[in-house]
Amino acid sequence: MEHNHEFEGGHEHRHDHDHGPEHSKYEEALAKYNIRLCDEDVKAKTALLIEKHVAENNTPDVKKFLFHCIDLTTLKCTDSDESVMKFTGKVNEFVDKYPDLDNVAAICVYPNMAEVVNDTLEADHVNIACVSGGFPSSQTFTEVKVAETAMALHTGADEIDIVIPVGKFLSGDYEGMCDEIEELKAVCGEHHLKVILETGALGSASNIKKASILSMYSGADFIKTSTGTVSYTHL
């Protein structure tokens, strides 16, 4: 059964509900990797890596690099045109206050604030990132996610952050999850699509690895751990 939907801008939205052979391609992708992980082993290996490498990476150069990777974010219910303009102004002033440091990578805001940042941002080499797709829960219609993403890009966003549909993933609907990511990546085109796994809700290292593989398989340019709105797992 196939449904086609089209929204302003000509993007075609497709749902192909053939769960037999389609489902197998996702299982086939996962079968290429070891996804049966022991949580305690992962925890121990992670602790060992930190212990082994933290000292050598605790340097000014590494810290400068990490700072330059930051998406400076305001995602508050109290955000307004005025507050976001002021927030962006701090990024504009950064180069004068700290000439020896590279600026942040991006300013991240809700989609309706992309135009405000675009009109205010003067700093070089700082992108405009927008959360989209029913952030942070990802619980809305795919059509809404597509429209929201397209509007964010149209009004100035350089890159888009979405959250995987966690409910679909946990229920084994890999086709539904992957189709949605693929569709949003098609809207983004050459713009980066960053996919947030919401690891605190996934429950195990195996699930985190599966969600990572499926997200990248579906076109994610980056994967990220969490929105910060869900408690961490025990991992």
Residues covered by each model-derived region:
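Active-site cofactor/substrate anionic-group-binding motifs, chiefly glycine-
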Residues: D102-T155
